[in-house]
From Swiss-Prot:
General function of this protein: Probable neurotoxin with unknown target. Possibly targets ion channels.
Name of this chain's protein: Conotoxin Cal22c
Keywords attached to this entry: Disulfide bond, Ion channel impairing toxin, Neurotoxin, Secreted, Toxin
Higher taxonomy: Eukaryota, Metazoa, Spiralia, Lophotrochozoa, Mollusca
Record remark on domains: The cysteine framework is XXII (C-C-C-C-C-C-C-C).
Tissue: Expressed by the venom duct.
Subcellular location: Secreted
Source organism of the structure: Californiconus californicus
Length: 55
């Protein structure tokens, strides 16, 4: 299977990471998920799809 998504606790929940993985798994190129929190101080988790070798 694909490697588990990176995330920065406590900002990114496992649910968010799983949802991102699901979203990205259908992407033909960027099928890996990377999650990070907003460095500006927002508690929001920002997840996006990346090429697997960019992780």
């Amino acid at each position: 299977g694909r490697p588990s998504a990176r995330y920065d606790a406590p900002y990114c929940s496992q649910e968010e990471v799983r949802e991102c993985d699901d979203d990205c798994s259908g992407n033909p190129v960027r099928d890996a998920c990377q999650c990070a929190y907003d460095p500006a101080g927002s508690p929001a988790c920002d997840c996006f799809c990346v090429e697997p070798w960019r992780r």
